[in-house]
Each structure stands twice: as C-alpha cells, then as structure tokens.
Amino acid sequence: MKTKITDTSNAINAGGRAEKWWKGKPVKSRSSSWTRNQDDVDLQSILQRYNLKGFEFGNWLNNNERYDRVLACEDSLAELSKIIGSKNLGIESLVGIAFGARGMSKAAAHYEPGYNMINITKMDGDGCLAHEYGHALDYNLGKYVDQNKRYNYLSGGRSVSKTLTGNQGGNLRNIMNELVDEASSMLNVRLDEYLDKKFGKNPKEENMRRAKARMQGSFMYWRYRHEIFARLFEQCCCYKLKQKQSSDMFLTSSWAFYTKSNAALFYWPEAEFKRLLPKMDKLIRVFKITLNIK
C-alpha cells in the first residue's frame, strides 16, 4: 500500500495556495511527516541527489497523482542532469518544485523567483519542467553568481531590448546575452514578418491598425528576454534527447511542437536553432562548471 506523500517540510509551502488554504482551516491539523517503506517514493533521496530545496503538493492532488508526478519528475531530473552535466540542479538547495500547489490562471507551469519555486500544474504541466528550470537557472545564477546591479536575471529579465548594453558581467552573463541577442533578433524578424503578412505593413483601415496593435501587444510576452532564453533552453533539451532517439514528455514537448505546430512561431525553426546551438552549448558548459564548484 502506498504511504501518503506530503510536502517535504513546513518551510517549503511559503507563498503556496495550499498554505493559504490550510491557514483558512485552523480547526484542522495537517500532517507534515510520512513513513517510508520499500514500496514508497523516496523523496528525501531525490532531494539530496539533486540538491533541491523540497517538494510541495497541492491539496487537490490525490496520492496516486502525487506518485505519478514525482516519478515523472525524477526521470526528468535525471535527463536534465545529463544535459547540463551536474546533479546540483537545486543550486545548493535554493530551488524547489511544487505540483499543483501554486497554479496561476491560464499558466500550465510557472517559476516564482521570490520563493524560488517551480510549479507544475495538475492538469497541463506536462512538458514544462525544462522551461521553468531555465528560468530558475537564469535567475539564480544572475542574482547570486554573475551579478549585475540592474538585472537579477542573466538574460535581462522582462526587457524586450534586442541588446542590453548595461547587462555586462562575467562569462555566464556575457555568453547568455550573446545567445539571447541573436535569438531575439531571429524571433523579432519572424514576428514582425508575421504581423506584416497578416495585416499589411502599414494598414490603411482603422480596424486593421487596431487589430495589428492588439496583436503586437499580445506578442510582447514572447519577446521578453528571459522568456526567450527559457523557450530556447527547453527546445535545446528536447533536441539533446532527440539526438539520442529519446524523448521525455514531462521535461519538454515534442520536436514537432517546436518546429511544426502553431506554437512554432514563438520558437526557432531547425535551421535557426542549429545556428544558435554552438552558443547554447557554450553556455551549458559554463553552467556545468558553475554548478559543480564545491
């Protein structure tokens, strides 16, 4: 019989929806411990292996769903550690992972820099771990390792600038910005061409001008520098698995999703991606060196 899986510590729930729910139920006690046997998922072993802060589970995940998420996540962490070349994925226990505990409206998954938590939603979070982990790398290595007074994120965060002259630093920050500059340039050309083709370069009709402006506004999110890096990182993880004739649908989406689906507009066609790959590989090598420093 499976033992009930619960959060790995009381501290991990800070800021989560599950914490808020329990705060509103003061007459109920909450279990914060669990007993392992040989049939159980060993949460502490996974945390120690990858230096993670902890796991958090939403109240709306039943025990079987918790097992499924943890087992899928464990496999994905193993793949991620091979791609990066380090098991220090939690960056000295800074980063934790939540399952269905911190959901945001319309978001399949998200990263919370304030609490350093990656949240994978109950229903739609499959394929999102690499993307959100890319955010965690970008933020933590920028805030604590290769620092810049203006930008916590190595990439420059929510800036939409094609280049950031003030975002200078050491190897991590400089290589990251070379990569994001080039990826941003490719993406912006493609998005602008799409808008011009759909509405015309200078539409004469008022309704077309307004429609184009609305779509330009909706594209802003896709132009954020930290989002560009996270999407490129997840696409890179998928490509590395594809090279081994493998896939991991909890870690990333399929290669066809990135290159042939409707979402492909916001990623990089294979030819463009391969032009970016040497810079991405260079950055991953520096990630490896940084994460493996004792």
Q: Where would I find each of the regions flagged by the language model?
A:
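Active-site-flanking segments in enzyme catalytic domains
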Residues: K2-R69, S86-K294
